[in-house]
């Protein structure tokens, strides 16, 4: 068996989606049609959930840089810092959950769809399996409530959980060293990163 990423890198806002190009590459050769080729691989989506993303402040910083500088591009040093922070930084609890093989669902897809539409449908199928298997932490529930200014998920975290997460976000904001730091914008981006896994989980399990 082999493991392969669903996309090139993690989404900066934690709204991870399978890239159609990955599926096209997997289905490029073999017997039968696209569905047959993918079914031969017995694909089982794997969901990886992190309590904390050590690169969150770097991602938020990049969001503002791209907003303020239209042609902004990361340097090699930026990439190395992201890799180092991602590998060595604190992630809290990490959960791996393997979904069942998607062959049965693949077999129910309309094989006569134009290939672009078929790959979109397959990507959506994989995404739903991954999102439904996320482990949702208190960080996600608190972030969602803070972002949308509600108390919808208050039963999923304690007052101490909320206080700890707010303190964590404040600390990550302090690590951003932009000269024209837009704190409100950056805070919203940080909260969005932690709220999106819950948003996607709810959509996948309703």
Question: Across the structure, where does each feature detected by a protein language model lie?
Answer:
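Membrane-interfacial terminal anchoring regions of lipid-handling membrane enzymes
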Residues: 1-2, 9-206
């Amino acid at each position: 068996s082999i493991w392969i990423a669903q996309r090139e890198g993690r989404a900066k806002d934690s709204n991870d989606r399978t890239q159609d190009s990955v599926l096209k590459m997997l289905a490029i050769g073999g017997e039968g049609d696209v569905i047959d080729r993918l079914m031969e691989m017995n694909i089982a989506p794997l969901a990886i959930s992190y309590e904390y993303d050590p690169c969150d402040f770097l991602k938020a910083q990049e969001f503002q840089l791209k907003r303020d500088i239209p042609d902004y591009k990361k340097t090699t040093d930026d990439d190395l810092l992201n890799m180092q922070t991602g590998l060595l930084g604190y992630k809290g609890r990490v959960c791996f959950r393997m979904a069942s093989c998607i062959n049965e669902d693949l077999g129910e897809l309309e094989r006569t769809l134009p290939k672009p539409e078929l790959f979109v449908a397959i990507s959506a199928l994989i995404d739903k399996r991954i999102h439904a298997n996320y482990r949702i932490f208190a960080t996600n529930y608190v972030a969602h409530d803070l972002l949308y200014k509600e108390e919808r998920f208050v039963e999923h975290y304690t007052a101490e959980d909320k206080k700890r997460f707010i303190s964590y976000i404040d600390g990550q904001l302090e690590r951003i060293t932009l000269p024209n730091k837009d704190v409100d914008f950056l805070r919203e981006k940080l909260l969005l990163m932690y709220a999106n896994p819950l948003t996607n989980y709810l959509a996948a399990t309703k």
